[in-house]
Regions:
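Asp-box/WD-like beta-propeller blade repeats and closely related beta-sheet repeat scaffolds
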Residues: 73, 83-86, 101-148
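Conserved beta-propeller blade signature
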Residues: 48-52, 95-98, 152-156, 211-215, ...
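Conserved beta-strand position repeated across blades of beta-propeller domains
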Residues: 32, 41-43, 89, 146, ...
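Beta-propeller domains
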Residues: 44, 48-70, 110-112
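Short loop/turn segments immediately following the C-termini of beta-strands
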Residues: 45, 53-54, 101-103, 109, ...
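Blade-loop segments of beta-propeller domains
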Residues: 38, 60-94
Length: 375
């Protein structure tokens, strides 16, 4: 399956991008049309971008001449079945990891073999063994996968409820549902790294400290302005970030308000506007953008669906000082138009070899490229 890259849809998106507001000196353009585009992974040579979805496809966006514009978009490994293959990540050596709803696979040298229909796939976590099959859900099963400074895999496992019920907590703590798990890259030595997560769909390691930072989507139905969304900083293994005792930030959930939370709950580094849906994120490690952006976090707010006054649909930037204090502000906005309708919903962020930034949008079915061109 090939996706046409020109026509009315591309023209329409280019018109929308004229309304996106960013700091002076930045430009945004359409990089590729990619249906349902979610998490992204740039291959080490920079000639192919792999894009996950919440459907049944992984897409490959190729730029063979490396001119910064997509040449072709096709489905990856069409002979294989994928089930919510949201999470994609490359190792430095070119191994592609794909985290599905209940399966994790590795594809050696995917950058060089994606042209053919048949590719080598290695089970890292066999199908049905990432979570108990009885816990499979469409809700909160979009995984992200990362490789840590320790060379291990880190995989988010959202819990499927609005608020996790008490009778599930023991199972979830054992399996890492409502948390982040880590394992060796062959799938061995699995352990729970993070507890007390509701549904995280964005994570990255600080390029200097190696600490894991991650976003979390918080409880619905408590009101327009509570609880806040979260950007979290994890300083050691085993920390608990408060779900289900806390709905977001320090706001207690109705279901657990009479229950004493565990000791040592870690509260977020940044509380974000309620229901804006903070999803994918990445640290900026390139040299193209002005110096103040070095090692800052760029993150995508997907936009609300259950708020009287819609919010989100923008790219945020978070500056972190030497003590780990974080300050977040809007960087690119305008996908929520003046009629309060969504013209797009940014979902995830990744960086290109030249220091440009790519932003995926599963609502528009597009990937945008943001670069700094100077004043």
């Amino acid at each position: 399956t090939f996706i046409a890259q020109d026509g009315p849809k591309a023209d329409n998106i280019r018109e929308i991008l004229k309304n996106i507001k960013m700091p002076a000196g930045f430009k945004i353009e359409l990089y590729a049309l990619v249906p349902d585009a979610r998490d992204m992974a740039m291959a080490p040579q920079g000639t192919a971008l792999f894009v996950g979805t919440r459907k049944d496809k992984v897409w490959v966006v190729s730029d063979r001449d490396r001119d910064g514009v997509a040449d072709e978009v096709k489905d990856f490994a069409p002979s294989l079945e994928f089930d919510v293959p949201n999470g994609v990540q490359f190792s430095k050596a070119g191994f592609l990891y794909v985290a599905e709803r209940n399966h994790v696979r590795m594809f050696p040298a995917a950058e060089f073999f994606f042209e053919g229909p048949d590719v080598v796939a290695v089970d890292i976590v066999p199908k049905g063994e990432l979570i108990p099959e009885g816990e499979e859900s469409y809700n909160h099963t979009a995984r992200v996968v990362d490789i840590g400074p320790d060379n291990k895999l880190y995989i988010s496992l959202g819990q499927p409820y609005n608020v996790a019920p008490p009778e599930k907590l023991e199972l979830y703590n054992q399996t890492g549902i409502g948390g982040i798990i880590r394992m060796d890259r062959d799938g061995s030595n699995r352990e729970v790294f993070t507890y007390g997560v509701r549904n995280s769909v964005g994570q990255d390691f600080h390029p200097v400290t190696g600490e894991l930072w991650w976003t979390d989507n918080q409880v619905d139905g408590m009101g327009d302005d509570i609880p806040p969304g979260e950007l979290n900083r994890q300083t050691k293994a085993g920390q608990n970030f408060g779900h289900p005792w806390f709905g977001g930030g320090k706001t207690r959930t109705n279901e657990y308000k009479g229950v004493t939370p565990p000791d040592g709950i870690v509260h977020p580094a940044v509380e974000t506007t309620a229901h804006c849906a903070d999803l994918g994120m990445a640290f900026y490690t390139g040299d193209q953008f002005p110096g103040k952006y070095k090692n800052a976090i760029f993150s995508a707010q997907h936009g609300s669906w259950n708020r009287t006054e819609p919010c989100g649909a923008r790219v945020m930037v978070t500056y972190i000082d030497d003590k780990g204090n974080a300050k977040m502000e809007p960087f690119a906005e305008g996908w929520l138009n003046e009629n309060k309708e969504y013209d797009g919903r940014p979902m995830s962020i990744t960086m290109m070899k030249d220091g440009s930034m790519l932003v995926s949008d599963d609502y528009a079915g597009a990937i945008y490229k943001i670069s700094y061109v100077g004043s």
